[in-house]
Amino acid sequence: MKKLKAEAALKGPVETRRAGTDRSLRELEAATHRLVVRRLRDMLPGRIVTKRLILRAPIRGDVPELLRLADNQAIAKWLARLPSPYTRADAVGFVEILAQRPDERPYAITLGDRLIGVVGFSFAEGKVPELGYWLGEPYWGKGYMTEAVKALVEAAHKTGQFEIIHAQVLADNQASTQVLEKAGFKHRRKAKGEIGNSAGKPINVLELKRPRWM
């Protein structure tokens, strides 16, 4: 009986130390991830200029156009993370909170001085950078999204750090799939969506590898 009590007494501290070590390792991994993605984020240019567009950081002045364009079920139904209905609070939160997070790097797509959409990267722990985007419905069919995506992935590749970029689209979203294909993305696999509007629905995962010459 004394032996059993002694073993039980020893087991508690050992398990406590092991749990503490595991927690410390997870915290270290999380801190390392934050440093890595912040470095990736900061290596991207603050401003990207194309033939017709300027990609730049979202600003508070974008809120009215964000609200006008993003509050549209024709857009939201294709996106996993866009709230619907889209409120002024959502627009302000995007500009002042989400856009400032180290694991997000969104760009406002602007035509002249007017926001027409958003494109950017998310950096989830343990995953390659993921491209996401949306374009206001009045600007569909004019090649703006393809132009913006091509410019952003080219800028990412020029850093020398974005070896692979992923993108996920709902399987029946042909327009978005064509944008990615025109930018050089290749189909990688089929899957099921996990969050938001994509949850449980068939999705296509595409990827773009950095050209060897860059």
Question: Which role fits each region the language model picked out?
Answer:
Residues 74-96:
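Conserved GNAT-fold acetyl-CoA-binding loop/helix
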Residues 60, 85-89, 103:
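Generic alpha-helical scaffold signal
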